[in-house]
């Protein structure tokens, strides 16, 4: 227990919520790690600590024996995904291959092969600007760099807008806050973290969307 520092600079955050795992990997304490992600808990610490991670599709890696007592995730399970963390993309891929698959204790887990159909001319959409939001120059440059790598490998790159990003966030918040905190066992977090999560949950109380409407909207957006 104790404060987790960013191994590159103690004045900077290691990110979260899987910041401890990311810091351990970046500092050489561990070659590989496992975390979970609802809204960035794998991806945020990965970019803060300079390692590799991803949020797989829900069910790709079975969610068992990770957070004690949190196997029954309720509606939070719609977003909750287990994922690997590593110092390189190659290590990340190998870890994902090892962990993926069906597990009897996770009804959302699935067995799907990784060598599925790949389009002859794969496409990727990139977003470099968001309405009413500022994106740091370094982030835009990283997106452009990734797009160039894909383009050099034969991908078709298309720059698109994301006009409903705030609406998507509100839907995510409404679904997530519909009882998620009740599913977390008592004494899982320290008091300051508990207070932060309570404030986070209160954000959705002013949203006029009902849970049913939010779920319907989520399905509509997934079809677009």
Residue positions per predicted region:
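Short glycine/serine-rich loop segments
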Residues: 1-96
């Amino acid at each position: 227990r104790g404060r987790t520092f960013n191994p590159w600079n103690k004045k900077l955050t290691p990110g979260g919520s899987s910041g401890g795992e990311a810091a351990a990997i970046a500092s050489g304490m561990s070659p590989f790690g496992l975390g979970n992600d609802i809204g960035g808990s794998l991806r945020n610490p990965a970019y803060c600590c300079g390692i590799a991670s991803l949020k797989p599709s829900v069910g790709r890696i079975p969610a068992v024996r990770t957070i004690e007592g949190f196997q029954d995730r309720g509606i939070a399970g719609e977003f909750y995904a287990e994922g690997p963390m590593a110092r390189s993309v190659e290590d990340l891929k190998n870890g994902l291959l090892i962990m993926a698959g069906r597990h009897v204790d996770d009804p959302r887990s699935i067995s799907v092969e990784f060598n599925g159909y790949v389009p002859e001319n794969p496409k990727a959409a990139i977003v470099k600007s968001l309405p009413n939001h500022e994106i740091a120059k370094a982030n835009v440059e990283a997106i452009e760099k990734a797009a160039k790598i894909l383009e050099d490998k034969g991908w078709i790159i298309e720059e698109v807008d994301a006009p409903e990003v705030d609406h998507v966030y509100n839907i995510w918040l409404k679904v997530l806050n519909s009882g998620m905190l009740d599913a977390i066992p008592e004494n899982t977090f320290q008091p300051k973290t508990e207070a932060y999560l309570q404030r986070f949950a209160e954000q959705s109380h002013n949203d006029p969307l009902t849970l049913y409407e939010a779920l319907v909207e989520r399905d509509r957006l997934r079809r677009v």
